[in-house]
Amino acid sequence: VVSGLFGTTDSLRLTAAAPSRRAVYVPLGSQVPGMARACDLLTVGYQLGDASQTMSAQPSGLARLEGDRLQLDLAQKNGDTQSQMAGLQMVAPEVTGLVFAYFDGYQWRSDWDSQALGGLPMAVEVLLDITTPPRVFRPGYSASSRQATTQSFRLVVALPLAKAIDTSTL
C-alpha cells in the first residue's frame, strides 16, 4: 500500500499518512464502527455520485469519499460496495459534470497512478459543470429566467513539489 495520487477522468483519490490520536487501531477486516482504522494511511477521493446511491438514474452530484486505505482496498477487492459507500458523502448536489486530467510535465493524461509512475503529476485539471435548479415562478420574471442553467468551470491545481515524468517512454 502506497501513498500518492490515483485517478481517472471521473474520479480522483489521494492517499497520505494521517496518524490520529483519536483513532482506534483494529485488525484489518474488523467490524468496529466510528474512528476505527487499520493503518495510518487515509484515502480522500472525489467523484460524481452514482445512481445506486439515489433514486434517480442521473449522477447525483459531487461526492467525497474518506476512509482508511486498507479497509477501502479490502472492501473493493471483496466487492463490498456497501462498505465503500459508507464513507461516501454528497458535498455538492448541484455538480452535474466532473472530469479530471493529469499533467506529467510534458502532456495531459487521462489517468494517474503514483505507484506505477513513480510520483505525483505536476498539475491536476478539474472541469466542473454546475447546474442551478429552475427558479420558482414569480410574476414579472420571464419564462427563460426560470429554467435550469449549467455553467462550466476549469481549475488547474499545480503541485509544486512534483517533478516532470515523461510517461510516453513508460
Spell out what each predicted region is.
Residues 1-80, 127:
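Extracytoplasmic beta-strand-rich oligomerization domains located immediately C-terminal to a leader/signal peptide
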Residues 85-170:
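Short linear sequence signals and composition-biased patches located at protein termini or domain-edge surfaces
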